[in-house]
């Protein structure tokens, strides 16, 4: 059974601990090392009277057994005072067991305002007050365990207990919300509905049954739910007589009873009543997101089908297998995506490129001599092809986008992305996998420039709750994630994301409101908008490229990553990297929490030698080559004269098709001057970037260099004023 569950050093507050269940909890916690605060007002089960005797007796009993405990005699309506006792005595608060309660049983017609109010004040408001007083302390220490006490009367209702039932079910709603709010701070909140003999149940249970339902048969569940190793959160449990059962909500598939552009009528409700109440193939929603998601799905069906009077969803089970199978191989409509340097720069800024790092300039300044698109900009191109609604139109796929998670991503580049261009994208459903709890749709997107394949994206999309249709679980078409090596990383780099990171990244085209709208994020179960997974993906890939390829985009071949947990803007990303040959394994963590957010990831790089897209020596016979060669020949005769006039070194970057095709240097500073292919051997005074075609236009006098500069066709850096002397060079010495 493993080692005993201990609570050494944990501070536990139990309300209503003077007798019955509360006493059993207090004794059990103390026996296992907890520091216990025994709260009890000292009144009877109707809430009448007060005194210190009940709490003192339990404290004394704990101390006799070698434990540590203090008493508190305040009403739970004064929660701050109750929690202060724990803080004053032990300096912290780890566990709150909201157990205090009273009864005022009356048939509904006989319940007075006082009967109603006092029940809610003690049970519901009292639990609220005590828990709220402990909440901030638990958040600061990143730990807390909370128990709310409901009852079978609250869950199912009971004659003569309308006031009590309402308060007890209210506690369940309170607990469910606290479970959601507290989980990021490691605060768990669960609800129990105990059946046990106590001061309260003596009035509603036979004496022999009260004796059989000992509090000691409930306490073990409470201790387990409050232990640091228990991950249960937001659960509801009935417990008694040594039996424990977990409860959950169940919902029929229901029926859509209205048509588009027609009023909904009670007659339609009546006609579909059997379907509405049919629990065959019932769903079991576990969150408000799942509940809301089904409503969104209904609205989509009404809008697309014009109205459904029958329960189409009920046919899903019998047709799911053939439906999903029919989706395999289906293609989305062809999609064209045009972009300029602006989109490439916007993306680079969105994934953390910055002027703080001079090496990033090539990704964020179009005038950089080696301006390049980050390789992972390719995911934006692939994603765009799926965002036009085509995915929802594929036969066999019924997609509720509120339940879609991005599971994994693969990107392969066949050549570096052009700095600007227009690509045609073709997307196809490569496979559909049944994972039980959901369906994985494998989408392949191929992007072409003319007929040349530029990149291949593979998106793994997980549809929550759509599994169990009997389909296959694996596929040879999936690009498989690979576990990281079992050794310390070879390199670790960190990036602190901005609070505006998601707002900036979404400008690249991912408009999902989950990443910007607090209300939408709340509906999805998050405290605030989260960062795009592909944004984190871009941060990590950029770091791998920088660390192991010196930002040479021509070496980037492929990347695969699995998305594990969300990131909040403002958190610090820690990319850990392992080099094994030309494969760089990596994982990404949130530094503040230690959570792994990208796992089983890798980047494949091309070998160092012979892999550049086109080096200067490979420039070949561009039109500009003849001009530079001619300038070189002329300098042999009149070089000293030109050097005296110019006294500068010019480095030229000649582009072709958006990429650098050749580099040339005209050295008019040393000796008799010289012209050679390649970058300047020393520091260049001026670097000039323009296309092969525009260079020829300048040489032929058809394009004024100044106008070319101000229109962006010619870019220069360094001592730009020296470029004015170029007209003399080109005009006088480059005539063909």
Curated annotation (Swiss-Prot):
Its EC number is 1.1.1.n12, 4.2.1.107, 4.2.1.119. SUPFAM superfamilies: NAD(P)-binding Rossmann-fold domains, SCP-like, Thioesterase/thiol ester dehydrase-isomerase. Residues 624-736 form the SCP2 domain. A motif (Microbody targeting signal) lies at residues 734-736. Changing residue 347 to A: No hydratase activity. The modification Phosphoserine is found at residues 52, 304, 309. It comes from the Eukaryota. The modification N6-succinyllysine is found at residues 46, 57, 68, 84, 275, 356, 424, 579, 663, 725. SMART domains: PKS_KR. The active site is at 164 (proton acceptor). NAD(+) binds at residues 13-37, 40, 75-76, 99, 164-168, 196-199. GO terms for biological process: alpha-linolenic acid metabolic process; androgen metabolic process; estrogen metabolic process; fatty acid beta-oxidation; fatty acid beta-oxidation using acyl-CoA oxidase; fatty acid derivative biosynthetic process; long-chain fatty acid biosynthetic process; medium-chain fatty-acyl-CoA metabolic process. InterPro entries: HotDog_dom_sf, MaoC-like_dom, MFE-2_N, NAD(P)-bd_dom_sf, Peroxisomal_Beta-Oxidation, Sc_DH/Rdtase_CS, SCP2_sterol-bd_dom, SCP2_sterol-bd_dom_sf. Bifunctional enzyme acting on the peroxisomal fatty acid beta-oxidation pathway. Catalyzes two of the four reactions in fatty acid degradation: hydration of 2-enoyl-CoA (trans-2-enoyl-CoA) to produce (3R)-3-hydroxyacyl-CoA, and dehydrogenation of (3R)-3-hydroxyacyl-CoA to produce 3-ketoacyl-CoA (3-oxoacyl-CoA), which is further metabolized by SCPx. Can use straight-chain and branched-chain fatty acids, as well as bile acid intermediates as substrates. Homodimer. This is Peroxisomal multifunctional enzyme type 2. (3R)-3-hydroxydecanoyl-CoA binds at residues 406-407, 435, 510-515, 533, 563. Keywords: Acetylation, Deafness, Disease variant, Fatty acid metabolism, Isomerase, Lipid metabolism, Lyase, NAD, Oxidoreductase, Peroxisome, Phosphoprotein. Residues 1-305 are annotated as: (3R)-hydroxyacyl-CoA dehydrogenase. Residues 484-600 form the MaoC-like domain. GO terms for cellular component: cytosol; membrane; peroxisomal matrix; peroxisomal membrane; peroxisome. Present in many tissues with highest concentrations in liver, heart, prostate and testis.
């Amino acid at each position: 059974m493993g080692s005993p569950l201990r609570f050494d050093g944990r501070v536990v507050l139990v309300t209503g601990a003077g007798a019955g269940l509360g006493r059993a909890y207090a004794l059990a916690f103390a026996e296992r090392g907890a520091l216990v605060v025994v709260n009890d007002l000292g009144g009877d089960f109707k809430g009448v009277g007060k005194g210190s005797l009940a709490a003192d007796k339990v404290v004394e009993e704990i101390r006799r057994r070698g434990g540590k405990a203090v008493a508190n005699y305040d009403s739970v309506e004064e929660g701050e005072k109750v929690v202060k006792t724990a803080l004053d005595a032990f300096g912290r608060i780890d566990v709150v067991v909201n157990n205090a309660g009273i009864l005022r049983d009356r048939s509904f017609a006989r319940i007075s305002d006082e009967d109603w109010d006092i029940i809610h004040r003690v049970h519901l408001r009292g639990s609220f007050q005590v828990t709220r007083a402990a909440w901030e302390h638990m958040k600061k220490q990143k730990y807390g365990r909370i128990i709310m006490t409901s009852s079978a009367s609250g869950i199912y209702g009971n004659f003569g207990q309308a006031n009590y039932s309402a308060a007890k079910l209210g506690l369940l709603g309170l607990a469910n919300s606290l479970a959601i709010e507290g989980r990021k701070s490691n605060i768990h909140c669960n609800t129990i509905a105990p059946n046990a003999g106590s001061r309260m149940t003596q009035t509603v249970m036979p004496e022999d049954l009260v004796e059989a339902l000992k509090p000691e048969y409930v306490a073990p569940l409470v201790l387990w739910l409050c232990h640091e190793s228990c991950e249960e959160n937001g659960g509801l449990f009935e417990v008694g007589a040594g039996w424990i059962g977990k409860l959950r909500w169940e919902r029929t598939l229901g029926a859509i009873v209205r048509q588009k552009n027609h009023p909904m009528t009670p007659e339609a409700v009546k006609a579909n009543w059997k379907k509405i109440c049919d629990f065959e193939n019932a769903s079991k929603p576990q969150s408000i997101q799942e509940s809301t998601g089904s409503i969104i799905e209904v609205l989509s069906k009404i809008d697309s089908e014009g109205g459904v009077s029958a329960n189409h969803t009920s046919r899903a089970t019998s047709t799911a297998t053939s439906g999903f199978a029919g989706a395999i191989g289906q293609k989305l409509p062809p999609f064209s995506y045009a972009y300029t340097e602006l989109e490439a720069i916007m993306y680079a800024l969105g994934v953390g490129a910055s002027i703080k790092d001079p090496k990033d300039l090539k990704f964020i300044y179009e005038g950089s001599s080696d301006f390049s698109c980050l390789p992972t900009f390719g995911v934006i191109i692939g994603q765009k092809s799926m965002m036009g609604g085509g995915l929802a139109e594929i036969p066999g796929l019924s997609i509720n986008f509120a339940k879609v998670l991005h599971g994994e991503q693969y990107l392969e580049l066949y050549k570096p992305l052009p700095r600007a261009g227009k690509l045609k994208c073709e997307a196809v459903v490569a496979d559909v996998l049944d994972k039980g709890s959901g369906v994985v749709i494998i989408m392949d997107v191929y992007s072409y420039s003319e007929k040349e394949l530029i990149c291949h994206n593979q998106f793994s999309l997980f549809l929550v709750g759509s599994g169990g249709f009997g389909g296959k679980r694996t596929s040879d078409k999936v690009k498989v994630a690979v576990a990281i090596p079992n050794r310390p990383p070879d390199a670790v780099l960190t990036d602190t994301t901005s609070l505006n990171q998601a707002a900036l990244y979404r400008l690249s085209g991912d408009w999902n409101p989950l990443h910007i709208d607090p209300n939408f994020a709340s509906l999805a179960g998050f405290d605030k908008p989260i960062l795009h997974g592909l944004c984190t993906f871009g941060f990590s890939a950029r770091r791998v490229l920088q660390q192991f390829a010196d930002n040479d985009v021509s070496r980037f071949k492929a990347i695969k990553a699995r998305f594990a947990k969300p990131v909040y803007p403002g958190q610090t990303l820690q990319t850990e990297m392992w080099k094994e040959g030309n494969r760089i394994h990596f994982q990404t963590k949130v530094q503040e929490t230690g959570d792994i957010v990208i796992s089983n990831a890798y980047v494949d790089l091309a070998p160092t030698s012979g892999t550049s897209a086109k080096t200067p020596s490979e420039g070949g016979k561009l039109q500009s080559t003849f001009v530079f060669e001619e300038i070189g020949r002329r300098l042999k005769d009149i070089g000293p004269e030109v050097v005296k006039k110019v006294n500068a070194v010019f480095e030229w970057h000649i582009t072709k098709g958006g990429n650098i095709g050749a580099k040339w240097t005209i050295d008019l500073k040393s000796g008799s001057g010289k012209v050679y292919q390649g970058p300047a051997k020393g520091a260049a005074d001026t670097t000039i970037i323009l296309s092969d075609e525009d260079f020829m236009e300048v040489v032929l006098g058809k394009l004024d260099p100044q106008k070319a500069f101000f229109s962006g066709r010619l870019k220069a850096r360094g001592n730009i004023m020296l470029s004015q002397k170029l007209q003399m060079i080109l005009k006088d010495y480059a005539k063909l």
